[in-house]
Amino acid sequence: MPRSRSRYIPSLDGLRAFAVLAVILYHLNANWAPGGLLGVTVFFVLSGYLITGLLIEEWKSTKTIDLKNFWLRRARRLVPAIVFLLLCILVLTTLFNHELLTKMRPDIIPSLFFYSNWHYIFSNLSYFDALGAPSPLTHFWSLAIEEQFYLVWPLILLALFKARTTKKAFCRIIIVLAAISALAMALLFDPAADPSRVYYGTDTRAFSLLIGAWLAFVWPSTQFAQQSAKLPRKTFFALNGCGIGAGIGLICLVAFTNGFSPFLYRGGILLASLCTAVMIAVAVHPQSLLSKGFAARPLVWVGKRSYGLYLWHYPLLLLMNPRNYTGETSPLMYLAQFAIIVACAAFSYRFIENPVRHGAIGKFIKAVRAGSIALPIYLRQHSVPVFAATLLTVIAIGGLIFVPPTAAIGGLDELKANSNTQATPPPPPPEVTNAYDILLIGDSVSVRTIPYFEETFPGGAIDSAINRQLVAGTQIYNHYKDAGVVGTIVVFALGTNGPVTDEDLDELLNTVGADKSIYLVNTRCPDSWEEANNATIARATQRHGNVTLIDWFSLSANHDEYFDGDGTHLTEEAAQIYTAMIQQATAEDMKVVLDNKAKAEAARQEAYSVADQAAQEKEQAAA
């Protein structure tokens, strides 16, 4: 097959470095990169651009697309590093963390066969709120989307090429498909619900890949292969102005958005995709500043290993940062962890990815086919890696077969069973004719406190649910208000599952009104929004005179034993402590409520007594 005219572009490796570093910062919960998850969007646009460019050049050269060869190349590029990673993580979790092993078991097959995103969707597994420790393979959702694109897109291109589709028609088709995908994301997104469905979906993420594909048609990198002449001044400034502006826009999106921002799903990811496309268009031009800046050796070095960095960073971070750790991790410790991630990715690149890419598997197959002499020689020459691979495989298989599921994970079934999973809360029981003494509306953190809360506050009510957002609190409260059962004390234990804004919190508090005693329980969760949410809750207590803070964050500090493996949900001991904390915080208001109830009951009994005495006197007079 004639070789394509595709060229290596170092600056695109630099852009890969930006993308993978953004993702790592996001998973490190860096407060200044809450939108680091957009690094995946950068990868999508890059993949769409490069893969489509290769397929276009192959069609131009051969008037066909060798699908088998294309898919084999993709498999050679992706699968060996994945298999090596899986073996290593299985070994590490078998030896050191059985909870993570339990979590990753059901994800291994979906990850190997690139359908993990749909596995998470149909299993209702959230990307943003993992009950228990997250699976070390959660991040494979993006690889699944890319591989699904690699499977389908060449077929579509080949069919359109054979139908003699013009370049203009190609571009129109791609734009329509991308628009449908972006519209699906906007329409399916529900601000009050977990956004994982639109975050994981191939249908709702395809537009990023398609924008890259569109760019490959209108701005192919091959057209700049021979360009060395200096650009006119105006063209130079226009080109670089666009690239720098797009870069600033992308950085702002990383810095000021997060996984729960409605803007992100209603145009933000689309905007990030367009910014990435502009940056690619500028970076592939050899005379641009981005081309030179992103071609810096450190960035290129990181970019070449970005695939390995992406594979390794998430499981290693989970292993090195237990989510139930409530202490502070020093910057030096984070640097050490980053160095370990880089070392693993570099090892994978040097000894797994590159050798396979350069025919190591083919050489091994040739050795086997050569017979009994060549194979022993081959194995003897590679005795250390063969022994290591065998040992890893034995330990990994042993862990899968013999390590039982952890009890911590099993306890989560109880959370789901106790959680209110209905869209609206159930109606109050028929015997409730007066207001509840206290009403608590919470998320999954307070689910385990339900039996203790009901025992502590027999005249109260608790409504807690998994994946509940703060913005849903208004609807839940109004339901109880309309039922006429809201007393004077209302507790909100929300803010675990996503960012909380001053506006949303004020709307909730204003809905309740100034005539209630409101308590806000702050949060402890190993997520990027923890610090900001707690600050937002603290500010609300200063703006509203009837609002009091219940400081769970401080009470739980340095008490790793309070939490299940996810560092968020409570153990049985902690559920009792959590309930006692609420009891202590609300004691004065509860005393007033109970005193008033006692007085009302005494008055009622006195009224009954007076009425009864009057009836008796009336009967005696009649006699």
Go through each PLM region and give its residues.
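Periplasmic/luminal catalytic loop of GT-C fold multi-pass membrane glycosyltransferases
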Residues: 488-491, 501-515
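Structural recognition of the beta-strand scaffold that forms the well-ordered cores
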Residues: 44, 69, 113, 439-441, ...
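Surface-exposed alpha-helical segments enriched in charged/polar residues
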Residues: 300, 510, 538-539
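Extracellular/periplasmic envelope-modification machinery, especially enzymes
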Residues: 231, 257, 324-331, 342, ...
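Active-site segments of SGNH/GDSL-like serine hydrolases
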Residues: 508-535
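Acidic-histidine catalytic/liganding microenvironments
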Residues: 296, 515, 543-544
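Hydrophobic membrane-embedded alpha-helices
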Residues: 2-12, 18-405
